[in-house]
Amino acid sequence: MHGEPARLYWRRRKVRLRPLVLILDISGSMADYSRSLLQFAHSAKRSAGRVEVFCFGTRLTRVTGAMECRRPDEALERAARAAFDWDGGTRIGDSLDAFVRGWARRGLCRGGIVVICSDGLDRGDPAVLAAAMERLSRLSHRLVWLNPHKRDDPAFRPSTLGMMIAAPHIDLLLSGHDLASLEKLAAVLPGLN
């Protein structure tokens, strides 16, 4: 009860980075962008701790393990071997539904930032895509969509059915067509925490 008063030190609150989930379209319509998106995913996985990477064409494939390779070319080669539907068709809704059912409900993206990289060209059932996007937007903290067709056009309006269905659930729509646009994404991600 007697003695010197204790000195209280306030510590700053630790900033915790949210988990980052990258879901990359590797279908034929995204062939011009798939390699650069996977290189971005490799860099993200190597520089940040809680990063999960998935690819899809007609089905979802988890490639997080492949992204842990030190050499980017080896990581891309392993990812290409894992995804049998590279440069094939696109079933965005089915792939996102598989992600929600198999991974998101287990807490993988709960409170995290989910980045979907796709042009929105989908051959699947629009109702499946709508339901998957709605569930994904509820489970994640932020839902970002990279569409390489957006380029740097501020007047861009979604024109594909997949993009029109996804648009109401997206928190941020960015381009993903070149290195500068991926650098912009990297700069924006910390602010989404």
Give, region by region, the residue ranges found by the protein language model.
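Exposed acidic/Ser/Thr-rich ligand/metal-binding surfaces
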Residues: 93-142, 184, 188-193
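Short beta-strand-loop
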Residues: 55-79
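Short acidic, Gly/Ser-rich segments with clustered Asp/Glu that frequently serve as metal-coordination loops
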Residues: 21, 26-35, 60, 121-124
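Structural beta-sheet core signal
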Residues: 22, 53-55, 114-116, 145-147
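Von Willebrand factor type A / integrin I
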Residues: 133-193
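Von Willebrand factor
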Residues: 74-112, 150, 154-157
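Acidic, polar low-complexity linker/tail segments
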Residues: 1-20, 31, 35, 39, ...
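Short glycine-/polar-rich loops that comprise or flank the Walker A/P-loop
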Residues: 18, 47-51, 111-112, 139-142, ...
